[in-house]
């Protein structure tokens, strides 16, 4: 079977199953089976797959059709132009989270020290450490997630130290910038998530309590303890979470609290400046 035929058959199977982005998914899975770069698919459409390549490709398609996320099959997801290893212990980095990176670079471009609370794959901490040329610390409650994050930091030569703890409870600071993409799915909405999210990604990284904003209210007081005066706390938030997260800033020494929406016009990033 040729590359061209394999792509067409993969697309047909994925499209008939109603899966999103069937063409792109077929390409990614075939590339994973071939251990090739994307340009190879179009420069060698008549390449004949070996028996082993076809078996791998067929298995990957079968796993995706059962609902397993593509990123769990390939074990990689790109974020801000860099490859990050993922695992079932980590949330898969989303393109929307790149808005947090952009806001951090614009708002706190001079930060020399930063903290990422609930790091998962390490995508935020690693990206900001490299883009800002800053020293980063990243925390997570999950030992397995931190193993993935450490691998990513080593692979990308990022200056990040990792600490296993609940939020930032084990840290003393100070930091110029604190970022977090904490769990923000309300408990009542967990059952409504897409199966590939609900059944495959860690609930520890998804479930944000009854309202979906409880963890923000725990992070803000810790940020007050850890930030340098004039430092920034920047969150990713859920599309219905703005009011609840703003409430976490309401009674502390915070100014310039502002919201940024994503490309779909949904509330995505909320930030505040620590001014004691």
Map each language-model feature to its residues.
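Conserved AdoMet
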Residues: 30-106
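Conserved beta-strand segments of alpha/beta enzyme cores
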Residues: 83, 135, 159-161, 255-258
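A general structural signal for well-ordered alpha-helical segments in protein cores
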Residues: 7, 26-27, 54-58, 70, ...
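Non-catalytic accessory regions of SAM-dependent methyltransferases
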Residues: 1-42, 46-49
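Mobile active-site "lid"/loop adjacent to the S-adenosyl-L-methionine
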Residues: 184-215
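Conserved RecA-like P-loop NTPase ATPase core
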Residues: 29, 153, 181, 197, ...
